[in-house]
Amino acid sequence: MSDSSAALSIECVRVNSLDIPQARDLDTIRRVIEVAGQGPTTLPNLMELTSFSKRHVHYRTHAARALGMVTMSRDPVLVTLTSAGSEMLATAPYSKGEAELLRKGFESGPLGPFASMMLATPAPTLDVFAAAVGAAGLLSPATARHRAQGLLAWRTRLLGEAKGTQSEDRQLILF
């Protein structure tokens, strides 16, 4: 399927804008899932246990929900691990098992309409994918582009092609 034909098929679908995540780093989304794995938790508790800002906790929790890894109840908001989230936590980060579960969550949840386009080979161009995201989510072009970039950042990990980095490799060396 070409970029343009996939984009046309997505334009016919509507996706709630809350279901199109703003979180681009699957490691931080996984951290939210890990905390939810300790038992139902509130957003303030997630902030405390992850050291993420309120805004970023919201972004990452909505992304985990869109992937089917957590649920969110209302009044009070409680974030609870799903069986898919539990299965994912039993896998190692960056493993084929994790990729399979993340991909399954992506394909079967509210992000499903984007799956065939995002996971296609070759990858869609940012412009074409952003247009599809914008049309499906009724988003402004700038917002659609930002969210499309975030989703495309997940692509290699969902396909099982991402390589994990050890924490030592990610540290800033000052001396």
Regions from the PLM with identified roles:
Residues S2-F175:
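Donor-sugar nucleotide-binding helix/loop cap in glycosyltransferases
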